[in-house]
C-alpha cells in the first residue's frame, strides 16, 4: 500500500468544490496490470444492493428466445448483443447517459467472460466467483463488504468441507454474455452477503432453479440479471454482456432501463423464490447431498440462510437498507408464488439440462480459481493476515477512462448531497430574512445529481409494497438511479487499500477538503424516509437504534455497512467536526468553567457534532418533526451538559474523546440490554435452529466491521482488517463472545477514525421470532432504559475523530449487567496516528486464561467466552450453593409464600443463586466482574431487608466470607485484583451537644453549615447535633461566638437541616487501558495525577513486558533539612545496629514537611486580667514544624509516623522561652519489623528532643492524652486492629521513653506538671507556660471566670448580711440587744471564715489555687522534661537559639487539621496497609505540588511557569516554549510572575521559593508605602502598576485576572504575618480579618475536640501510673497497685479513651467488699493537693456495694450529660462508672467502667496506699495507722452518705434551665406554673436536669448540717491526730485554696467549648460550703474524702429524706468531724 491505513482521511470532511476532486482525478495514472487478472471481468456490477450475493456463471440454453430491442431510458440493447444498438439518450443535466454507460456498451469480452468451464460442478466448497463485487473476483471498482460483514470463515485458507458452505444463492439473475456462463455474485468461498441479498427458499422438491441447461448448484441470479426461468427485461444486460434468457415476460415495463429492471427485480422482491412445481429442486443447502433436511424448514417464516446453511433472521417487513439499498426484502407466505413464477417455470426447465452439463466443469474450475485467488490474496496481504474481501477485487488493468467516469459520478453524488444541504440552509436563512451563508453552486451536472438523489430517497420501484405485490416487477425509469446506488454501494463497502476507483479519492481525503455529509439523514435517511419505507413500518434498518447512533441513519450512503465515507476507503481518515449527522442548528456549545490548553484544539462545530452523537445514542431518529418535541430538546440539553462535563474534566483531547465515546457506548449498551432480553425470550422456542457455540463459530464473532446490535454506527472505535473478516454468527447467547484470530495477535488498526464502521453482517440468529423483536426500532427518546442510561452511566472513554484508538474494538451483543461502580473513566487516551504502530499493534496481550481478541470497546470489561466463564466461575458457584449458609439464597424469593408483601418494594433488583446459575449458562455474563456484582447484589439485598440479628443476615455474612475466600484466587487468575466489594470507612460524626456524645450509623442528626470564601480564605462553620441534643437546644439555636453568652451571632434551629448518617462511599475503579479490566484504584495503586499515562494492569504489563513507570513524586524526593537529616540518620543507624545485615530491607525516610512561624494569642480572660496590667505578654511567637516518617514496604513508600511540634525560641518572652511543646503525635502500625516499632518511635521522639537540646532549648512538654472516640490526630482512619492506647498505657509508654532518654543523656529529668509547679513555686497563672492548643490556657480561663464569679457572690452575700444587720439596728429594747448579739456572732463567724480561707491558700491567689487543684487532678497526663541541667543552663541561656533550617511553606501540613480534613475528603485512609500505600502516594504528590499553586501560573501544556495568559479563557496559560507550538483561537497576553528569582520548580528547594516570596512581599510593602514618583527600585514601579491595576480590574471578583490572582495570593502571604494596625498593603486588613475568623472557627472545633478528649480521659481519670516523681512506695510504676483491703489485684491495663470501639469507655471497678470497693477516695472540690485525692476521685461513687437504686438513677440520668462540680477543667465533667451490670448509657453508647481502672486509681491516691508518698510535700510526715483507720471510717461513713450527694448535672442545659426558672418566677397563678411544668415534661431529659438542679440547691445546706453534726461526734484521738497534722495541712492544702472553686466546673457550653457564666442560684451554695469545709480540713484530712466532689453522684428525693437515718447507725464513722 502507498500509505499506512491509519493515516487515511475520511471523505466526510467538508468539500466545497467538486471540480477540485475531478481535476485531481484527471491527473491520476492507471494502476499497473496483473497478468493473472487479465481474464477477469473488470466491469462493475449494477446491483443496487452494493454487495450482492455470490454469482456463478451458467450457460444459457441455446434455444432460449431473446427479448426484442427496446429503448429504455438511454439504453437500447438487444439480446445476444454485446454492443448497444443505439447510442444512449441524453439525460437531464447534460450528462450523456449513465456514467456506467460506456462500460455497459463497450464491454471487454475477455473481462466479461468467465473462465469457468461450462460443466463446472457447483458442489465445491469454494464457489467460483468472478463477479467484480466478490472478494475472489476481479479487483474491480466496487469491492464487496469486508469479511467482517460476511458470514462464514475467512477466505484466507482452505475451508472445511461439509454442508455449511452453500455454493450459490437462489433467486438472483446472473450476468453472462453470449454463450458464457452467467456470473454469480458470491462472497468469498461462495459466501452470501446477508447485508445485501435476501435468502429465498426453494420449493419442497424438484430440481433447483435453472435445472435445465444450468449447473445443478446454480444458486440464483446475480445482481443485474434476471432470474433464470423468469422473463428478463428486454435489453437487460450486466457488465456489458447480454444475458440469454427465456421468453420475455409481459410484465416488463417499457421506459425502464432493462439493466435496472434486471438489477432491481430480484433484489427488491419479497416473494418466495420459485415456489411452483417447475422448481422442485431444493436449495443446495437443503438437498440430501448437503446433509440437510429434505424440506426447507423455515419457509413459512421467510428465513435467510447464512453460508453454513444456518437460518438467519430476516426482516418481517420490507428490509430496506438505511442507505436506500433494496438489498433485503421479505417474501410472502410460503406457497404464494411470485407473479413472475409461472412465466419463469418454462425457462428454468429449459435451462436445467445445460446447467447439469456444465456443473462438473464449473466445480473443477471454481476450485482452481479459488486456490489461485487464495495465493494471490496471501501475496498481496502478506502471510498471517486474513484476506479482506475487497483486497482482490479490482483489476489493475482497467481502462482509466472508465474508472474516471465512475469516480466523477461518485464525486458528483457526494457533492450533490452537500450542495443540497447548503441550499436547504440558504432557504432556512432566507425564511428568517437573513443572508444565505452559501453561494449558489455552479458545478456542472450538480442539479442532475441532486435530482437523482432526491428521487432515490423515495424510489419504491422494484421493492415490495405490502399493498401491491405487483411492484416486484416494476422497473425504475429514472436514469442514474440504479447506477448511483451501485457506485455508492461500492464506495461504502470497498475496503481495499489499492482499489483503483477509491484510492484516488483516498488521496484527496488525505488533504483537508471541505467535504462532508453533515446531515445526509435529513435529505435521505430521515426527512425523505429512505426508499419509501413508511415511517409507520418501524423498519429503517436492520438493527437496533443503538447501531444508528452517531451516523447518518437510513441514508442512501449507509446500509448494513454503515457510513460509506467512514466504512469505505476513507475509514482511516480523521473525522472532521461537521462529520456525520450532527443535530442541525445547535447553538454554540457552552464554554467550560475552566479552560485548558487543549480546549482550543476542539472547535465548536466538533463539540456540537459530538453532542449530536450523544443525542443519537439515545434517540437515533432526530428528524425535523422530532426536533420540535420538548423531550428531544431536553435530551439535547442533557447531551450538551454531559459534553460540557467531559470537556471540563478531560485532561487532553484524547481523554475528552475517550470520555464521550465511553458515554455513548454505555448508553448503547443499556439500550441493547433491554432489546436482547426480549430477543432471548423469543429465541427460546426456536433453539432447535440455533447454532451452538463452537471454536469455528467463535472465530466468526466479535467482528468490528460487522453490524451489531450493540454498536452505533458512529461509536468511534477502531477497525482492524482481520476483524472485518470475522462475520457474526452463532446463537443469540453466543454472539457476544470474541476470539483471537488464528495468529493470536491483534492486527494493526488501519483506521485512525476511532468510530467503528458498522458492517453489513448481522448476527445469525437462529429463530425467526427473534428477528421481529430485533427489528422493532426503539425510537422513544426517553424511555425507562434511556433514562437510566442518562443517570446511571458515568462517562467512559472512546476516541473520536482525528485520533487512532489504541484499542481495536469488537462488538459485543449480549445482556450486560449494569455496572454499579461509580468509577470515573480511566485515563485511556487514544494515541496519535504516529503511535498507532507501536500502541495499537500490541493493544491486547494474549491471555492464557481467556483467549479473546480483539480488545473490547473502552470501558467495557474484558469479555471471556462462555466456556471460560463456566470453567472459572462454576466451581465457585457450586461451593456457594452447597454451603449450609446458602439455604435462603438458592432460589428466588417468593414474597407471597413467605408472606413478605413489601419485599419487592424494598428490594428493587432481586437476585439469587439459581438466577446467577441461569445467567452463567445463558452466556449473559461477559466477565467475572459481572458475576461478582450479582453475588454481592444478592447479599446486599439480604442485608438490606433483614435485621442484623436475623438468621438470614448472619447467613449472608458467612456466605460473603466464603465467597471472598473462594473468588479472590479466581479473580486474580483471570487478571483482576480481587472479588471484594470495598467501601471506605464511614466518617465518625460528633455531637456538639452533650459531652462524649456521638452520632451512630443510620441515625438522624441535624447539621448547621455555612461557608464563605474571600481573598482565597475560606471560613467554614459546621456543627452537628444528634436528635436528642438538638431537641434540647433553645429555639434561638446556638451561639457562633467564642463567648457562649453572646447572642449577637446565633445560628437558629431553623437553620439546621436534618440528615442521616448513612453515606457510604465505595472504592473507585480504574480500567486497564489495554484490556479494560476493572481494578480497584487502591489495589492498582494508581493515581492519574501521578501516572497520567493511564493504568495498565499487571496482566497486560507482564504480557507486554512494560516496566512500571517511575513515580516522580516520592517522599524520598522531597527536600531534606537539618532536622530531618539528623532524625533519619539516627533512626536508620538504630535499625542497622539492631538488625545488622537485614537493615537494608527496612529503609526509613524522614522529612520535615512544614516549617512556619506563628504566634500564640492569649485568651480573653487572661488578657483582661493579666495582659492589660502588663503582667503577661499578649502573644508568644513560635515556630511550628511537621516531621513525618516513611518506610519502604514492598517497594512502596508508606507513611507511618507524624509529629507536630512548637518551638518557642530564645526571643519568646517568659514563661515560654526556650521551650518545645509536642503538640500532636500519631502513628499507624505498619512499620516493619514489628519488634522494633516502639523503639523506632522512641528514637524519633528522643532524637527530636536531643536535636532541640542542641539548638538551645531547655524544657519540653508533652500532653499524654489519647484521642477521643472516632477522633484522629494526624492519620485518617487507623487500622481497626490498632487499639488506641488507654491513658495509663500511653503514660507508661511516655514514661518508658523518657527513662530511656535519661539513661542516654538526652533528657536530664522529667516530672509531672503538679510536681513541676511545686518545685517552681508557681504562685500565679502567669508563671505557667502558655502553648497554642494546650489544655491549660482553657483551664486558666475557667479558673479566672470562676474566681470572678465567686468574688461577686461573696460581695452579694456580704451586702445581704450587711442589710440584715442594718435592719436589726432599727428595733429597740430587748430585741435590739438580741440583734446586736446576733450581728456580733455573724461578724465573728464571717471573720473566722475568711481567716480560715486564707490559711488554706498558700499561694494567696485564688486562680493559682484552682490551678493547683487541676494540676493534681491531671498530673499523670502532663510531662515536663528538662533538657538542660540547672548547672549548664546559664551557659545555654547566654547563646540565642538560631534554627539552621529555613522556613518551609506547606498549606497542607500547616497544623494537623488541614491534612486530616483533606484526607477525609479524599479518602486517604490508613486503615490497612493497602490503603496506606495509596494514601501515601497521594500525600507525596500533594506535598510536591502544594507550593506550585497560588503564586504563579503554570503552563497548561507542560506545567512550567507560564508567561502567556488568555484574556478570554478562564484558565489558559502557556510558557514561551509551548506558545509557538500550541494553537489558540484567542489573543494571548504576556504576563510575568510577581515573584522574582524563584521558579515554580524551585519549590523542592523550600527556602528558595520562600525567599522569593519574601522579596516580593517586601517589594509590595515598599510600593504601597513609597511616595517617590522617581523611586529607583525597579520593583517599586512594577508593584505600583500591579496594585493600581488590581484596584481597577473588573475581572478580579470572579478570579479570572491572572495579575489580580497573584497579587491577592501575595497579599495573603503578607497578611498571615502582618501585625501593623494601619497596613497599606491592599486587602491586608480584610484578609487578616478573614484569617482571624478562620482561626477562630478552627479553634472552636479544636476546643470541642480537646474537651471531648479530656472528658474521655477524666472518665478514667487517675487511671494512670504516677510518674517517678510521685511514686515512692517502691512499687513498679507499670504494675498496678492492689486495692487497700482486697489484696493484690490482677495485672490489668489501664482504661483508655478514643477508640472507635467502646471498650475504652467500659469500665467497672474491681470487685471487693463495700469498704474495700469504696477505698477509692472521692475527689475533693478543688483536687486538694496533699490529700492523696488524685484524678481518680470522680470514679469513687460508682463502686461495688452502692445502692442499686442509685445505680439505676445514675444510669437514667447519665445520657443527659456530665455532673457538676468536677475537676474544674473544660470538659472534665465526670460520670460515675459502675460494676453492677448497668452500663453507663451515655449518648456515645459507653459501657461500664473497665475493671482495669481500680489499680490505676489507687496508684493515684498515695493517701490510701503510702502516707509518705503524698505529693505536695506531704510525704515524710508519716501518717500513723490511726489516721489510716480514720480514713477507712470516713470512707465507710461516706458510703452511707453517698446517696446524699447531689446528682450529676448536664451543664449544657444550663441556659434552658435558667429560662425555665425565669418562667416559674414570672408565673403568678397555679395554672401558669402547671403550663410551665407541662412544657417541661415534654422534654424528659430537660425535666430531669431541672430536678437535679433543685436537688443540688436543697442538698448542700443539709449536708453542711450533717457534716457539722458528725464533726461534733469525733473522737479525741482524731482531734489529736488532726492537731499534729495541722502544720503540714497548711502546706499540703495549698492547691485547695478554698474548696468552692472546684465546684463550678460544669457550666453551659457553646459549640466552641467555652464555659458560660455560672448561674447565680448555683453560686449561692459556695459560701455555705466554704463555711464548713475549712474546719473539716483542719480536723481530718481523711474525712475530706467523704465530702469530695459532692456533685458527682445522683441523689433522688427518697435518699435525701433518708439522710438522718443513714447517718445514725454509723456513729463511729463520724469521728473526726
Curated annotation (Swiss-Prot):
The modification Symmetric dimethylarginine is found at residue 234. Residues 1-182, 307-398, 558-593, 706-864, 1349-1401, 1656-1828, 1908-2017 are annotated as: Disordered. Residues 1378-1399 have a biased composition (Basic residues). One of its GO terms (molecular function) is histone acetyltransferase activity. Methylation by prmt-5 may repress the capacity of cbp-1 to enhance cep-1-dependent transcription of egl-1. The lineage of its organism: Eukaryota, Metazoa, Ecdysozoa, Nematoda, Chromadorea. Residues 1112-1492 form the CBP/p300-type HAT domain. It is found in: Nucleus. This is Protein cbp-1. Zn(2+) 1 binds at residues 1499, 1502, 1519, 1522.
Amino acid at each position: 500500500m502507498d500509505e499506512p491505513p491509519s493515516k487515511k482521511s475520511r471523505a466526510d470532511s467538508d468539500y466545497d468544490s467538486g471540480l477540485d476532486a475531478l481535476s485531481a482525478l484527471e491527473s491520476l495514472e492507471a494502476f499497473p496490470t496483473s497478468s493473472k487478472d487479465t481474464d477477469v471481468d473488470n466491469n462493475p456490477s449494477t446491483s443496487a444492493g452494493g454487495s450482492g450475493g455470490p454469482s456463478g456463471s451458467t450457460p444459457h440454453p441455446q434455444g432460449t428466445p431473446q427479448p426484442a430491442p427496446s429503448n429504455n431510458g438511454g439504453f437500447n440493447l438487444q439480446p445476444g448483443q454485446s454492443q448497444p444498438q443505439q447510442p444512449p439518450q441524453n439525460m437531464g443535466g447534460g450528462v450523456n447517459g449513465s456514467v456506467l454507460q460506456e462500460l455497459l456498451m463497450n464491454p471487454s469480452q475477455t473481462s466479461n467472460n468467465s473462465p469457468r468451464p461450462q460443466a463446472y460442478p457447483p458442489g465445491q466448497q469454494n464457489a467460483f466467483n468472478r463477479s467484480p463485487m466478490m472478494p475472489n473476483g476481479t479487483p474491480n471498482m466496487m469491492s464487496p463488504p469486508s469479511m467482517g460483514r460476511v458470514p462464514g470463515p475467512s477466505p484466507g485458507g482452505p475451508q472445511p468441507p461439509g454442508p455449511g458452505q452453500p455454493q450459490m444463492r437462489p433467486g438472483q439473475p446472473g450476468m453472462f454474455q453470449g454463450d458464457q456462463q452467467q456470473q454469480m455474485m458470491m462472497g468469498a468461498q461462495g459466501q452470501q452477503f446477508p447485508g445485501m441479498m435476501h435468502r429465498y427458499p426453494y420449493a419442497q422438491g424438484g430440481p433447483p432453479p435453472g435445472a435445465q441447461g444450468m449447473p445443478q448448484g446454480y444458486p440464483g441470479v446475480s445482481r443485474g440479471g434476471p432470474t433464470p426461468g423468469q422473463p428478463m427485461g428486454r435489453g437487460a444486460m450486466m457488465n456489458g454482456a447480454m444475458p440469454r434468457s427465456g421468453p420475455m415476460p409481459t410484465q416488463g415495463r417499457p421506459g425502464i432501463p432493462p439493466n435496472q429492471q434486471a438489477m432491481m427485480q430480484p433484489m427488491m422482491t419479497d416473494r418466495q423464490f420459485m415456489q411452483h412445481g417447475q422448481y422442485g429442486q431444493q436449495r443446495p443447502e437443503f438437498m440430501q447431498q448437503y446433509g440437510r433436511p429434505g424440506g426447507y424448514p423455515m419457509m413459512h417464516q421467510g428465513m435467510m440462510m447464512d453460508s453454513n446453511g444456518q437460518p438467519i433472521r430476516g426482516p418481517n417487513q420490507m428490509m430496506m437498507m438505511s442507505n436506500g439499498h433494496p438489498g433485503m426484502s421479505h417474501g410472502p407466505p410460503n406457497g404464494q408464488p411470485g407473479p413472475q413464477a409461472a412465466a419463469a417455470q418454462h425457462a428454468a426447465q429449459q435451462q436445467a439440462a445445460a446447467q447439469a452439463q456444465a456443473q462438473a466443469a464449473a466445480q473443477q474450475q471454481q476450485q482452481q480459481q479459488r486456490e489461485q485467488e487464495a495465493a494471490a490474496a496471501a501475496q498481496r496481504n502478506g502471510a498471517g493476515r486474513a484476506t479482506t474481501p475487497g483486497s482482490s477485487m479490482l483489476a489493475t488493468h482497467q481502462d482509466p477512462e472508465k474508472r474516471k467516469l465512475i469516480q466523477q459520478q461518485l464525486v458528483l453524488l457526494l457533492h450533490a448531497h452537500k450542495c443540497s444541504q447548503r441550499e436547504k440552509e440558504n432557504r432556512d436563512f432566507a425564511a428568517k430574512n437573513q443572508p444565505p451563508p452559501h453561494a449558489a453552486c455552479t458545478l456542472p451536472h450538480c442539479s442532475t445529481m441532486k435530482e437523482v438523489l432526491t428521487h432515490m430517497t423515495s424510489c419504491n420501484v422494484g421493492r415490495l409494497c405490502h399493498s401491491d405485490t405487483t411492484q416486484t416487477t416494476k422497473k425504475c425509469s429514472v436514469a442514474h438511479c440504479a447506477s448511483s446506488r451501485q457506485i455508492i454501494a461500492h464506495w461504502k463497502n470497498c475496503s481495499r487499500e489499492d482499489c483503483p476507483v477509491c484510492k484516488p479519492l483516498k488521496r484527496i481525503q488525505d488533504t483537508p477538503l471541505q467535504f462532508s455529509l453533515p446531515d445526509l439523514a435529513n435529505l435521505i435517511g430521515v426527512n425523505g424516509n429512505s426508499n419509501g419505507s413508511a415511517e409507520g413500518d418501524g423498519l429503517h434498518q436492520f438493527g437496533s437504534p443503538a447501531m444508528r447512533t452517531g451516523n447518518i441513519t437510513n441514508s442512501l450512503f449507509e446500509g448494513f455497512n454503515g457510513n460509506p465515507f467512514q466504512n469505505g476507503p476513507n475509514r482511516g481518515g480523521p473525522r472532521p467536526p461537521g462529520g456525520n449527522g450532527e443535530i442541525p442548528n445547535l447553538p454554540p456549545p457552552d464554554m467550560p468553567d475552566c479552560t485548558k490548553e487543549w480546549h482550543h484544539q476542539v472547535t465548536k462545530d466538533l463539540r456540537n457534532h459530538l453532542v449530536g452523537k450523544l443525542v443519537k445514542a439515545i434517540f437515533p431518529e432526530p428528524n425535523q418533526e422530532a426536533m420540535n418535541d420538548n423531550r428531544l430538546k431536553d435530551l439535547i440539553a442533557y447531551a450538551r451538559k454531559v459534553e460540557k462535563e467531559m470537556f471540563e474534566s478531560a485532561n487532553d483531547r484524547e481523554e475528552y474523546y475517550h470520555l464521550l465515546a465511553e458515554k455513548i457506548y454505555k448508553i448503547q449498551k443499556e439500550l441493547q440490554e433491554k432489546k436482547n432480553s426480549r430477543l432471548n425470550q423469543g429465541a427460546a422456542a426456536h433453539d432447535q435452529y440455533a447454532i451452538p457455540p463452537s471454536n469455528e463459530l467463535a472465530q466468526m464473532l466479535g467482528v468490528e466491521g460487522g453490524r451489531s446490535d450493540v454498536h452505533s454506527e458512529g461509536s468511534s472505535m477502531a477497525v482492524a482488517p482481520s476483524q472485518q473478516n470475522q462475520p457474526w454468527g452463532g446463537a443469540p447467547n453466543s454472539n457476544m463472545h470474541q476470539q483471537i484470530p488464528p495468529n493470536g495477535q491483534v492486527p494493526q488498526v488501519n483506521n485512525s477514525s476511532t468510530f467503528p464502521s458498522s458492517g453489513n453482517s448481522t448476527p445469525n440468529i437462529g429463530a425467526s421470532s427473534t428477528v421481529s423483536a430485533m427489528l422493532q426500532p426503539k425510537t422513544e427518546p426517553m424511555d425507562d432504559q434511556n433514562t437510566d442510561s442518562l443517570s446511571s452511566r458515568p462517562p467512559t472513554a472512546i476516541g473520536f475523530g482525528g485520533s487512532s484508538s489504541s484499542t481495536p474494538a469488537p462488538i459485543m451483543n449480549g445482556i450486560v449487567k449494569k455496572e454499579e461502580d461509580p468509577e470515573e473513566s480511566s485515563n485511556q487516551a487514544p494515541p496519535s496516528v504516529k503511535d498507532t504502530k507501536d500502541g495499537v499493534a500490541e493493544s491486547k496481550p494474549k491471555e492464557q486464561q481467556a483467549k479473546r481478541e480483539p480488545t473490547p470497546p473502552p470501558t467495557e470489561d474484558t469479555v471471556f467466552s462462555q466456556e471460560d466463564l463456566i470453567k472459572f466461575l462454576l466451581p465457585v458457584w457450586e461451593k456457594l450453593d452447597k454451603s449450609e449458609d446458602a439455604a435462603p439464597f438458592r432460589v428466588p424469593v417468593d414474597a407471597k409464600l413467605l408472606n413478605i408483601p413489601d419485599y419487592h418494594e424494598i428490594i428493587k433488583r432481586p437476585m439469587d443463586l439459581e438466577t446467577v446459575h441461569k445467567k452463567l449458562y445463558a452466556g449473559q455474563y461477559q466477565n467475572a466482574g459481572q458475576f461478582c456484582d450479582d453475588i454481592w447484589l444478592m447479599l446486599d439485598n439480604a442485608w438490606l431487608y433483614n435485621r442484623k440479628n436475623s438468621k438470614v443476615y448472619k447467613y449472608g455474612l458467612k456466605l460473603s466470607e466464603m465467597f471472598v475466600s473462594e473468588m479472590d484466587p479466581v479473580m486474580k487468575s483471570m487478571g483482576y485484583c480481587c472479588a471484594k466489594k470495598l467501601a471506605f470507612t464511614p466518617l465518625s460524626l460528633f455531637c456538639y451537644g452533650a459531652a462524649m456524645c456521638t452520632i451512630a450509623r443510620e441515625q438522624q442528626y441535624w447539621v448547621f453549615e455555612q461557608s464563605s470564601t474571600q481573598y482565597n480564605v475560606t471560613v467554614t462553620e459546621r456543627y452537628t447535633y444528634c436528635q436528642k441534643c438538638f431537641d434540647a437546644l433553645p429555639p434561638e439555636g446556638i451561639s457562633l461566638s467564642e463567648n457562649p453568652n453572646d447572642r449577637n451571632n446565633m445560628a437558629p434551629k431553623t437553620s439546621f437541616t436534618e440528615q442521616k448518617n448513612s453515606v457510604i462511599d465505595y472504592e473507585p475503579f480504574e480500567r486497564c487501558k489495554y484490556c479494560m479490566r476493572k481494578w480497584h484504584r487502591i489495589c492498582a495503586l494508581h493515581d492519574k495525577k501521578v501516572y497520567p499515562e493511564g493504568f495498565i494492569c499487571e496482566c497486560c504489563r507482564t504480557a507486554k513486558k512494560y516496566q512500571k513507570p517511575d513515580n516522580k513524586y516520592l517522599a524520598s524526593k522531597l527536600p531534606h533539612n537539618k532536622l530531618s537529616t539528623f532524625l533519619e540518620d539516627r533512626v536508620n543507624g538504630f535499625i542497622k545496629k539492631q538488625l545488622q545485615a537485614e537493615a537494608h530491607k527496612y529503609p526509613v525516610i524522614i522529612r520535615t514537611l512544614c516549617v512556619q512561624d506563628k504566634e500564640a494569642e492569649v485568651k480573653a480572660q487572661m488578657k483582661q486580667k493579666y495582659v492589660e496590667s502588663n503582667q503577661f505578654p499578649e502573644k508568644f511567637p513560635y515556630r511550628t514544624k511537621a516531621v513525618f516518617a516513611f518506610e519502604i514496604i514492598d517497594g512502596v513508600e508508606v507513611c507511618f509516623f507524624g509529629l507536630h511540634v512548637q518551638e518557642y525560641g530564645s526571643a519568646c518572652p517568659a514563661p515560654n522561652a526556650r521551650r518545645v511543646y509536642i503538640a500532636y503525635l500519631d502513628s499507624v502500625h505498619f512499620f516493619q519489623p514489628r519488634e522494633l516499632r516502639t523503639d523506632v518511635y522512641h528514637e524519633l521522639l528522643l532524637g527530636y528532643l536531643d536535636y532541640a537540646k542542641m539548638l538551645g532549648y531547655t524544657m519540653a512538654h508533652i500532653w499524654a492524652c489519647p484521642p477521643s472516640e472516632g477522633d484522629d490526630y494526624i492519620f485518617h482512619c487507623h487500622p481497626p486492629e490498632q487499639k488506641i492506647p488507654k491513658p495509663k498505657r500511653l503514660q507508661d509508654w511516655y514514661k518508658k521513653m523518657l527513662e530511656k532518654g535519661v539513661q542516654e543523656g538526652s533528657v536530664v529529668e522529667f516530672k509531672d506538671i503538679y510536681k513541676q509547679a511545686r518545685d517552681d513555686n508557681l504562685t500565679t497563672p502567669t508563671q505557667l507556660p502558655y502553648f497554642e492548643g494546650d489544655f491549660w490556657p482553657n483551664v486558666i480561663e475557667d479558673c479566672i471566670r470562676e474566681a470572678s464569679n465567686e468574688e461577686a457572690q461573696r460581695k452579694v452575700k456580704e451586702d445581704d448580711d450587711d442589710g440584715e444587720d442594718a435592719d436589726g439596728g432599727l428595733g429597740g429594747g430587748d430585741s435590739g440587744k438580741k440583734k446586736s448579739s446576733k450581728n456580733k456572732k455573724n461578724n465573728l463567724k464571717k471573720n473566722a471564715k475568711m481567716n480560715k480561707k486564707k490559711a488554706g491558700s498558700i499561694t494567696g491567689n485564688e486562680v493559682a489555687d484552682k490551678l493547683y487543684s487541676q494540676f493534681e487532678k491531671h498530673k499523670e497526663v502532663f510531662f515536663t522534661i528538662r533538657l538542660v541541667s540547672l548547672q549548664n543552663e546559664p551557659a545555654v541561656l547566654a547563646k540565642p537559639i538560631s534554627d539552621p533550617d529555613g522556613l518551609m511553606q506547606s498549606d497542607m501540613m500547616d497544623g494537623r487539621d488541614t491534612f486530616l480534613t483533606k484526607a477525609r475528603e479524599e479518602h486517604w485512609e490508613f486503615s490497612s496497609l493497602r490503603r496506606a500505600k495509596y494514601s501515601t502516594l497521594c500525600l507525596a504528590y500533594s506535598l510536591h505540588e502544594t507550593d506550585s499553586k497560588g503564586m504563579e501560573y503554570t503552563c497548561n501544556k507542560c506545567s512550567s511557569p507560564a508567561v502567556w495568559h488568555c484574556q478570554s479563557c478562564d484558565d489558559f496559560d502557556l510558557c514561551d516554549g509551548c506558545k509557538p507550538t500550541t494553537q489558540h483561537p484567542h489573543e494571548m497576553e504576556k504576563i510575568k510572575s510577581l515573584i522574582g528569582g524563584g521558579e515554580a520548580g524551585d519549590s523542592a528547594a523550600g527556602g528558595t521559593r520562600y525567599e522569593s516570596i519574601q522579596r516580593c512581599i517586601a517589594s509590595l510593602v515598599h510600593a504601597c508605602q513609597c511616595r517617590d514618583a522617581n523611586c529607583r527600585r525597579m520593583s517599586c514601579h512594577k508593584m505600583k502598576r500591579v496594585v493600581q491595576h488590581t484596584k481597577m480590574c473588573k475581572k478580579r471578583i470572579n478570579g479570572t485576572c491572572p495579575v489580580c490572582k497573584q497579587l491577592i495570593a501575595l497579599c495573603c502571604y503578607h497578611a498571615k504575618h502582618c501585625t501593623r494596625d494601619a497596613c497599606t498593603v491592599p486587602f491586608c486588613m480584610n484578609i487578616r480579618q478573614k484569617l482571624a475568623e478562620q482561626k477562630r472557627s478552627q479553634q472552636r472545633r479544636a476546643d470541642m475536640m480537646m474537651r471531648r478528649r479530656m472528658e474521655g480521659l477524666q472518665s478514667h481519670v487517675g487511671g494512670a501510673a504516677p510518674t517517678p516523681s510521685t511514686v515512692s512506695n517502691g512499687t513498679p510504676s507499670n504494675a498496678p497497685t492492689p486495692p487497700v483491703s482486697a489484696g493484690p489485684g490482677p495485672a490489668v491495663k489501664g482504661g483508655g479513651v478514643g477508640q472507635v470501639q467502646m471498650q475504652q469507655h467500659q469500665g467497672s471497678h474491681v470487685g471487693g467488699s463495700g469498704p474495700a470497693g469504696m477505698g477509692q477516695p472521692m475527689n475533693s472540690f478543688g483536687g486538694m493537693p496533699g490529700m492523696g485525692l488524685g484524678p481518680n476521685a470522680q470514679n469513687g461513687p460508682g463502686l461495688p456495694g452502692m445502692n442499686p437504686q442509685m445505680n439505676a438513677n445514675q444510669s437514667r440520668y447519665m445520657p443527659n450529660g456530665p455532673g457538676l462540680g468536677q475537676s474544674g477543667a473544660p470538659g472534665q465533667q465526670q460520670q460515675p462508672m459502675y460494676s453492677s451490670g448497668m452500663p453507663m448509657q451515655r449518648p456515645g453508647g459507653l459501657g461500664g467502667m473497665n475493671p482495669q481502672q481500680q489499680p490505676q486509681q489507687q496508684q493515684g491516691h498515695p493517701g490510701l496506699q503510702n502516707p509518705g508518698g503524698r505529693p505536695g510535700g506531704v510525704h515524710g510526715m508519716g501518717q500513723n495507722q490511726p489516721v489510716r483507720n480514720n480514713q477507712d471510717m470516713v470512707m465507710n461513713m461516706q458510703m452511707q452518705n453517698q446517696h446524699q450527694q447531689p446528682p450529676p448535672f448536664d451543664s449544657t442545659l444550663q441556659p434552658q434551665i435558667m429560662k425555665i426558672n425565669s418562667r416559674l418566677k414570672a408565673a403568678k397563678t397555679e395554672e401558669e406554673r402547671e403550663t410551665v411544668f407541662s412544657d417541661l415534661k415534654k422534654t424528659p431529659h430537660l425535666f430531669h436536669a431541672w430536678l437535679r438542679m433543685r436537688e443540688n440547691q436543697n442538698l448542700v445546706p443539709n449536708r453542711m448540717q450533717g457534716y457539722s453534726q458528725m464533726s461534733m461526734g469525733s473522737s479525741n484521738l482524731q482531734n489529736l491526730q488532726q492537731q499534729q497534722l495541722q502544720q503540714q495541712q497548711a502546706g499540703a492544702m495549698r492547691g485547695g485554696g478554698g474548696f468552692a472553686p472546684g465546684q463550678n466546673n460544669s457550666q453551659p457550653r457553646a459549640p466552641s467549648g467555652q464555659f458560660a457564666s455560672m448561674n447565680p442560684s448555683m453560686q449561692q451554695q459556695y459560701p455555705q460550703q466554704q463555711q464548713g469545709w475549712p474546719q473539716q480540713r483542719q480536723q481530718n484530712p481523711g474525712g475530706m474524702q467523704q465530702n469530695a466532689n459532692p456533685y458527682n453522684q445522683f441523689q433522688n428525693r427518697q435518699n435525701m429524706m433518708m439522710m438522718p437515718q443513714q447517718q445514725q447507725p454509723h456513729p463511729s464513722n463520724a469521728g473526726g468531724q
